[in-house]
Design a protein with these regions (language model features):
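Alpha-helix initiation/capping motif
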Residues: 1, 84-88, 138, 166-167
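Short, charged, surface-exposed secondary-structure boundary motifs
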Residues: 1, 69-76, 163-166
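Conserved nucleotide-sugar donor-binding subdomain of glycosyltransferases
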Residues: 2-49, 87-123, 128-129
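Short, mixed-charge, low-aromatic patches
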Residues: 4-8, 61-70, 155-159
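Conserved nucleotide-sugar donor-interacting segment of glycosyltransferase catalytic cores
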Residues: 21-88, 140-142
Length: 172
């Protein structure tokens, strides 16, 4: 995966951009967080768990979908949302974690070393374990993975948590 992505003319600029964003998050957010009591971010801000850890501040990560690794619910960004006996949610989470680790882990660990923090082994688990995960989706659209060991709550959909829908059709 690494060599294919590094040699891809289409993927290389994205990878470079993402790693640059992570470096800038460390550079810019640490001084800001030192002046505040808590860090609130989306789940796509890759450096924030390490930044909050370094600054010894609590972190609330928000997500508009179930975005914590588990065995029952697949990642919201990957295909196969219906049960599949071969490509299970656990396999999809492992695949997503491998892709995410490839894209962000080395850059995060480079910055963690710069700030005297131990390296992380797995970005997905590190971020989930080091934050309070606040899920912004309607409780009426389903529950969460019973295997989640991370601290979380469902806050409801930020635009309209009371809309009507066909529950039978949704379950299919």
């Amino acid at each position: 995966i690494d060599s294919a992505a590094q040699n891809s003319h289409k993927f290389r600029p994205f990878l470079k951009w993402m790693r640059n964003v992570i470096d800038k998050q460390f550079d810019q957010l640490i001084p800001l967080l030192k002046e505040h009591d808590i860090l609130v971010s989306t789940n796509s801000e890759f450096a924030v768990a390490s930044i909050a850890e370094y600054c010894k501040k609590p972190l609330i990560r928000t997500a508009y979908a179930p975005f914590l690794p588990g065995k029952k619910i697949p990642p919201a960004v990957l295909p196969f949302p219906k049960p599949n006996p071969i490509i299970t949610p656990a396999i999809l989470w492992k695949l997503m974690n491998r892709m995410t680790n490839f894209m962000v882990k080395d850059t995060i660990n480079k910055n963690r070393a710069k700030y005297g923090l131990a390296p992380i082994r797995n970005f997905g688990y590190h971020a989930g374990e080091r934050s309070y995960n606040y899920l912004l989706f309607s409780q009426h659209l389903g529950n969460v993975d019973p295997d989640w060991t991370f601290e979380w709550s469902i806050g409801g959909y930020c635009f309209n948590d009371t809309f009507q829908y066909d529950e039978k059709a949704y379950e299919e």
